[in-house]
Design a protein with these regions (language model features):
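Phosphate-backbone binding interfaces of nucleic-acid-interacting proteins
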Residues: 1-165
């Protein structure tokens, strides 16, 4: 069976760590298989940050793609090709940097889309595993701080789970 550490803390006043609780369970004769960390969203959205769309123009070789310049808080703006119909300059968005792995083991790589190099991905809710909306990218409030990790901005939790017999 699995026991949520956060659920347990709702009922017990204790400063014990998940591993200390597992050790105490073992000490009283409960067979504990281990303690594992589980992200609220698979992968914890590592490599996904709040970014700002600085520029947005029609792609020269497509009637539905846009070429954007994105500030992800690391320095020079990045060129990103985006197919979302609602992307516009001035928006704060969730941006997956090169190397990020989205739910479904989708790894973000530098790519060339119809002749334009793209250095990341502006994401919709369903692509991040935080909702079902795929009508367009997730647009954040104007005060969203550029460079903040998506995990921190969205207040996603890491859950410790104790597995026992």
């Amino acid at each position: 069976m699995k026991l949520s550490y956060n659920w347990l803390k709702d009922y017990l006043e204790s400063d014990l760590t998940p591993q200390q609780i597992a050790d105490a369970m073992t000490a009283i004769g409960i067979e504990v298989d281990g303690v594992e960390e589980q992200e609220e969203v698979p992968g914890g959205l590592a490599g996904v940050v709040v970014a700002e769309v600085l520029e947005c123009e029609a792609h020269p070789d497509s009637d539905h793609l846009h070429v954007t310049k994105v500030n992800d808080g690391t320095g020079d703006p990045l060129t990103v090709v985006c197919g979302a119909p609602n992307v516009a300059a001035g928006q704060k968005v969730l941006f997956a940097r090169i190397g990020a792995v989205l739910p479904g083991d989708f790894k973000i790589k530098k790519s060339k889309i119809r002749g334009v190099e793209s250095f990341g991905m502006i994401c919709a809710e369903d692509e991040l595993g935080i909702g079902n909306d795929h009508a367009g990218i997730k647009v954040l409030p104007a005060d969203a701080p550029v460079g903040t990790s998506a995990k921190d901005y969205l207040h996603l939790k890491t859950e410790a789970v104790i597995e026992y017999e």
